[in-house]
Amino acid sequence: MSQHLVPEAKNGLSKFKNEVANEMGVPFSDYNGDLSSRQCGSVGGEMVKRMVEKYEQSMK
């Protein structure tokens, strides 16, 4: 299991992951063994994209 830089952020990141997956139509659950690498990667990529956009907006 991976370790988070900020352990307190784990719940927030899980919630964010589920929100993004739902918006993209990817059926995330506690067990994601049925999902393709492409589906998982697209959710993770979208999460990173949104986090970077949010950070860039805060820099303005």
From Swiss-Prot:
Superkingdom of this protein's organism: Bacteria
PTM info: SASP are degraded in the first minutes of spore germination and provide amino acids for both new protein synthesis and metabolism.
Coiled coil: none
Residues marked Cleavage (site): 19-20
One Pfam family linked to the record: SASP
GO biological process: DNA topological change; sporulation resulting in formation of a cellular spore
Gene3D superfamilies cross-referenced by the UniProt entry: Small, acid-soluble spore protein, alpha/beta type-like (6.10.10.80)
The entry's keywords: DNA-binding, Sporulation
GO molecular-function term, one example from the UniProt record: double-stranded DNA binding
Family affiliation: Belongs to the alpha/beta-type SASP family.
Function in brief: SASP are bound to spore DNA. They are double-stranded DNA-binding proteins that cause DNA to change to an a-like conformation. They protect the DNA backbone from chemical and enzymatic cleavage and are thus involved in dormant spore's high resistance to UV light.
Protein name: Small, acid-soluble spore protein C2
Gene it is expressed from: sspC2
